Protein backbone atom coordinates (compact mmCIF):
# COMPACT_ATOMS: atom_id res chain seq x y z
CA UNK A 1 0.00 0.00 0.00
CA UNK A 2 2.82 2.35 0.91
CA UNK A 3 4.37 1.78 -2.52
CA UNK A 4 1.16 2.85 -4.30
CA UNK A 5 0.83 5.98 -2.21
CA UNK A 6 4.45 6.90 -2.97
CA UNK A 7 3.91 6.35 -6.70
CA UNK A 8 0.71 8.39 -6.61
CA UNK A 9 2.31 11.30 -4.72
CA UNK A 10 5.36 11.28 -6.99
CA UNK A 11 3.12 11.37 -10.05
CA UNK A 12 1.12 14.25 -8.59
CA UNK A 13 4.26 16.25 -7.78
CA UNK A 14 5.65 15.78 -11.26
CA UNK A 15 2.29 16.76 -12.75
CA UNK A 16 2.27 19.97 -10.70
CA UNK A 17 5.75 20.90 -11.87
CA UNK A 18 4.86 20.49 -15.53
CA UNK A 19 1.46 22.13 -15.12
CA UNK A 20 3.18 25.49 -14.77
CA UNK A 21 3.65 25.79 -18.53
CA UNK A 22 3.26 29.27 -19.94
CA UNK A 23 -0.21 29.97 -21.34
CA UNK A 24 -0.54 30.61 -25.05
CA UNK A 25 -0.67 34.25 -26.09
CA UNK A 26 -3.92 35.42 -27.63
CA UNK A 27 -4.96 35.07 -30.39
CA UNK A 28 -4.27 31.44 -31.08
CA UNK A 29 -7.52 29.70 -32.03
CA UNK A 30 -7.86 30.59 -35.69
CA UNK A 31 -5.56 33.36 -36.82
CA UNK A 32 -2.31 33.66 -34.90
CA UNK A 33 0.20 36.45 -35.51
CA UNK A 34 2.06 34.52 -38.19
CA UNK A 35 -1.15 33.83 -40.12
CA UNK A 36 -2.12 37.49 -39.81
CA UNK A 37 1.21 38.58 -41.32
CA UNK A 38 0.79 36.13 -44.19
CA UNK A 39 -2.71 37.42 -44.88
CA UNK A 40 -1.48 41.02 -44.86
CA UNK A 41 1.24 40.13 -47.38
CA UNK A 42 -1.29 38.37 -49.61
CA UNK A 43 -3.65 41.36 -49.46
CA UNK A 44 -0.82 43.67 -50.44
CA UNK A 45 0.18 41.58 -53.44
CA UNK A 46 -2.90 39.79 -54.82
CA UNK A 47 -6.15 41.21 -56.15
CA UNK A 48 -8.19 38.18 -55.12
CA UNK A 49 -7.12 38.64 -51.49
CA UNK A 50 -7.85 42.37 -51.71
CA UNK A 51 -11.38 41.63 -52.94
CA UNK A 52 -11.94 39.06 -50.21
CA UNK A 53 -10.58 41.44 -47.56
CA UNK A 54 -12.93 44.17 -48.77
CA UNK A 55 -15.87 41.76 -48.65
CA UNK A 56 -15.02 40.74 -45.09
CA UNK A 57 -14.79 44.37 -43.95
CA UNK A 58 -18.11 45.19 -45.62
CA UNK A 59 -19.68 42.28 -43.75
CA UNK A 60 -18.24 43.53 -40.45
CA UNK A 61 -19.44 47.06 -41.18
CA UNK A 62 -22.97 45.80 -41.77
CA UNK A 63 -22.94 44.12 -38.36
CA UNK A 64 -22.11 47.42 -36.64
CA UNK A 65 -25.53 48.82 -37.54
CA UNK A 66 -27.50 45.56 -37.23
CA UNK A 67 -29.68 44.90 -34.18
CA UNK A 68 -28.31 42.57 -31.53
CA UNK A 69 -29.29 38.93 -31.81
CA UNK A 70 -32.41 37.71 -30.02
CA UNK A 71 -33.08 34.25 -28.65
CA UNK A 72 -35.67 33.06 -31.16
CA UNK A 73 -36.17 29.30 -31.26
CA UNK A 74 -37.45 27.99 -34.59
CA UNK A 75 -39.09 24.65 -34.01
CA UNK A 76 -36.69 22.91 -31.65
CA UNK A 77 -33.64 24.81 -32.78
CA UNK A 78 -31.73 28.01 -32.14
CA UNK A 79 -29.39 27.11 -34.98
CA UNK A 80 -30.02 30.17 -37.17
CA UNK A 81 -29.16 32.45 -34.27
CA UNK A 82 -26.10 30.46 -33.20
CA UNK A 83 -24.75 30.39 -36.75
CA UNK A 84 -25.34 34.11 -37.14
CA UNK A 85 -23.53 34.69 -33.87
CA UNK A 86 -20.59 32.63 -35.11
CA UNK A 87 -20.55 34.54 -38.41
CA UNK A 88 -20.56 37.85 -36.55
CA UNK A 89 -17.69 36.86 -34.27
CA UNK A 90 -15.58 35.69 -37.20
CA UNK A 91 -16.18 38.86 -39.22
CA UNK A 92 -15.79 41.27 -36.31
CA UNK A 93 -12.66 39.50 -35.10
CA UNK A 94 -11.11 39.58 -38.55
CA UNK A 95 -11.99 43.23 -39.08
CA UNK A 96 -10.57 44.25 -35.71
CA UNK A 97 -7.35 42.33 -36.24
CA UNK A 98 -6.78 43.71 -39.71
CA UNK A 99 -7.79 47.34 -39.11
CA UNK A 100 -7.31 47.73 -35.32
CA UNK A 101 -10.50 49.82 -35.25
CA UNK A 102 -11.97 49.64 -31.77
CA UNK A 103 -15.60 49.72 -32.93
CA UNK A 104 -15.28 46.14 -34.19
CA UNK A 105 -13.96 44.94 -30.83
CA UNK A 106 -16.63 46.89 -28.94
CA UNK A 107 -19.39 45.37 -31.06
CA UNK A 108 -17.99 41.86 -30.62
CA UNK A 109 -17.96 42.42 -26.86
CA UNK A 110 -21.52 43.73 -27.00
CA UNK A 111 -22.61 40.65 -28.96
CA UNK A 112 -20.92 38.32 -26.47
CA UNK A 113 -22.49 40.08 -23.51
CA UNK A 114 -25.86 39.92 -25.24
CA UNK A 115 -25.81 36.18 -25.94
CA UNK A 116 -24.53 35.50 -22.44
CA UNK A 117 -27.81 36.98 -21.20
CA UNK A 118 -29.91 34.47 -23.14
CA UNK A 119 -31.92 32.21 -20.82
CA UNK A 120 -29.99 29.29 -22.31
CA UNK A 121 -28.48 28.22 -25.62
CA UNK A 122 -31.06 25.50 -26.21
CA UNK A 123 -29.30 22.54 -24.58
CA UNK A 124 -31.82 20.10 -26.05
CA UNK A 125 -30.08 20.64 -29.39
CA UNK A 126 -26.35 20.15 -28.83
CA UNK A 127 -25.34 21.87 -32.07
CA UNK A 128 -26.89 25.16 -30.91
CA UNK A 129 -24.80 25.06 -27.73
CA UNK A 130 -21.67 24.01 -29.62
CA UNK A 131 -21.92 26.85 -32.11
CA UNK A 132 -22.64 29.45 -29.43
CA UNK A 133 -19.69 28.19 -27.43
CA UNK A 134 -17.47 28.34 -30.51
CA UNK A 135 -18.61 31.90 -31.20
CA UNK A 136 -17.85 32.93 -27.63
CA UNK A 137 -14.42 31.29 -27.75
CA UNK A 138 -13.52 33.04 -31.00
CA UNK A 139 -14.81 36.36 -29.71
CA UNK A 140 -12.84 35.99 -26.50
CA UNK A 141 -9.68 35.04 -28.36
Where do the protein language model's features map onto the residues?
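N-terminal intrinsically disordered, low-complexity tails enriched in polar/charged
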Residues: 21-29
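Aromatic-lined, polymer-binding surfaces characteristic
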Residues: 28-43, 48-141
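Bacterial Sec-dependent N-terminal signal peptides
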Residues: 1-22
Amino acid sequence: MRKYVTIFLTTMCISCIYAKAQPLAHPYLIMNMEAEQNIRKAIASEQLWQDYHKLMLEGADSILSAPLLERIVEGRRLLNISRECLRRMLLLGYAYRMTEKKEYARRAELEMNNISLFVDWNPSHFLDVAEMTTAMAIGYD
